């Protein structure tokens, strides 16, 4: 009985969650760091669409660069993202933003706070610039949560 209720409840929740699909001709740019650059998730998304909707081709573009931070991505939005004329943009950042490489330095707390502030400023500017582009229908962000209080 309990399993039946769980199944019914999950089925109900699944029916309530509809993820819109990309339509024919959509242009999706995946922006990020090495996780995007070397990852294969964008290829899996393309393969999913090509095998299920072969009559509605989409374009998937990888704009990931290893070692990038949010401020690097912000600086290349015009020539590496907007020039591709995307209808969707997804961003993955955060791994290189918080200063994991500076924790052993004497002034680690100060350096980390500076990098966190720079990252937050970059996130805001990226958001503003993407939202100003009316032709980009959806903007998706994925980033690591920054600490609200830094303990070193």
Regions found by a protein language model. Give the residues of each.
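A short helix->loop->beta-strand "cap" motif at the edges of active sites that frequently abuts
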Residues: 133-137
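Residue-level signal for alpha-helix termini/capping positions
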Residues: 82, 131-132
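Bacterial Sec-dependent N-terminal signal peptides
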Residues: 1-16
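Conserved small/polar residues in nucleotide/adenosyl-binding loops
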Residues: 142-148
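Conserved SGNH/GDSL esterase-like catalytic core that processes O-acyl groups on lipids
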Residues: 17-124
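Short beta-strand segments at enzyme active-site cores
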Residues: 90-92, 138-141
């Amino acid at each position: 009985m309990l399993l039946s209720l769980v199944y019914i409840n999950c089925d109900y929740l699944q029916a309530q969650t509809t993820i819109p699909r990309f339509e024919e001709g959509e242009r999706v740019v995946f922006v990020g760091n090495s996780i995007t650059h070397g990852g294969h998730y964008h290829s899996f998304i393309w393969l999913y669409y090509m095998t299920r909707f072969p009559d509605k081709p989409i374009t998937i573009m990888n704009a990931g660069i290893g070692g990038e931070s949010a401020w690097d991505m912000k600086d290349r939005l015009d020539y590496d993202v907007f020039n591709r004329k995307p209808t969707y943009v997804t961003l993955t950042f955060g791994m290189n933003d918080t200063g994991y490489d500076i924790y052993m330095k004497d002034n680690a707390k100060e350096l980390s706070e500076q990098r966190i502030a720079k990252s937050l400023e970059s996130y805001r500017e990226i958001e503003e610039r993407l939202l100003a582009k009316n032709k980009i229908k959806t903007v998706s962000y994925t980033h690591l949560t920054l600490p609200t209080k830094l303990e070193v």
